[in-house]
Amino acid sequence: MDALVLFLQLLVLLLTLPLHLLALLGCWQPICKTYFPYFMAMLTARSYKKMESKKRELFSQIKDLKGTSGNVALLELGCGTGANFQFYPQGCKVTCVDPNPNFEKFLTKSMAENRHLQYERFIVAYGENMKQLADSSMDVVVCTLVLCSVQSPRKVLQEVQRVLRPGGLLFFWEHVAEPQGSRAFLWQRVLEPTWKHIGDGCHLTRETWKDIERAQFSEVQLEWQPPPFRWLPVGPHIMGKAVK
């Protein structure tokens, strides 16, 4: 099976050789950083229609929280275009973190469309190192379709726990690997080396639920969801919350 995967990976590499050459020369990353926000804006507009009811169900739990300073202090990690803003309850104080500064103009548009929120700031940073944020400064951290593309999910979750107050909540929604041994998992393995370039570091075969369960949260609630688009190689999704 491994030999078949390697053969098919090489075949895909040959078919996408210009992309891999650009990546090897260091030219692809700036291109991807510039145009990936437009791709995400288009994709989230379509996928959120399919996931809207579940998203509302997940984030409706935020309104039951009481922030340490009144309104709920919410950090969105890997905020992207701000597509989640519509689901947050009135008065949330939202801080946004994303390593790609090109998302900021999309965030500005989302902020204008969601006046029910208080916007604190946009921080350009990686989730593995959010030194700009103080310990125990957040009531809620939201992480959707982010842990697939970070360098180290373990370090990101450590940072999440650092910035969350005791009893604070992590809300997550992530795509994960298909069941090992399945045909879908085989194709994820085949496509992953190329997909990482297309998806700005996105990994198709991560078992992110294991990272969350190992992260020493006091409680984890997790639910599986089918992928919104069968024509994409992303696998099933997990949604839920974890308590510090």
Swiss-Prot record:
Organism: Mus musculus (Mouse)
Entry's Gene Ontology molecular function annotations: S-adenosylmethionine-dependent methyltransferase activity; thiol S-methyltransferase activity
Keyword entries, A-Z: Cytoplasm, Endoplasmic reticulum, Lipid droplet, Membrane, Methyltransferase, Microsome, Signal, Transferase
Similarity remark: Belongs to the methyltransferase superfamily.
Function statement: Thiol S-methyltransferase that catalyzes the transfer of a methyl group from S-adenosyl-L-methionine to alkyl and phenolic thiol-containing acceptor substrates. Together with TMT1B accounts for most of S-thiol methylation activity in the endoplasmic reticulum of hepatocytes. Selectively methylates S-centered nucleophiles from metabolites such as hydrogen sulfide and dithiothreitol.
Residues spanning the signal sequence: 1-23
Compartmental location: Endoplasmic reticulum membrane; Lipid droplet; Microsome; Cytoplasm, Cytosol
Record-linked InterPro entries: Methyltransf_11 (IPR013216), SAM-dependent_MTases_sf (IPR029063), Thiol_S-MT (IPR052356)
Catalysed reactions, as listed in the record: a thiol + S-adenosyl-L-methionine = a methyl thioether + S-adenosyl-L-homocysteine + H(+)
Lineage of the species this protein comes from: Eukaryota, Metazoa, Chordata, Craniata, Vertebrata
Protein name: Thiol S-methyltransferase TMT1B
GO annotation, biological process: methylation
Originating gene: Tmt1b
EC class (word): transferase
One Gene Ontology cellular component: lipid droplet
E.C. code: 2.1.1.9
Topology within the bilayer: Peripheral membrane protein
Chief location category: endoplasmic reticulum
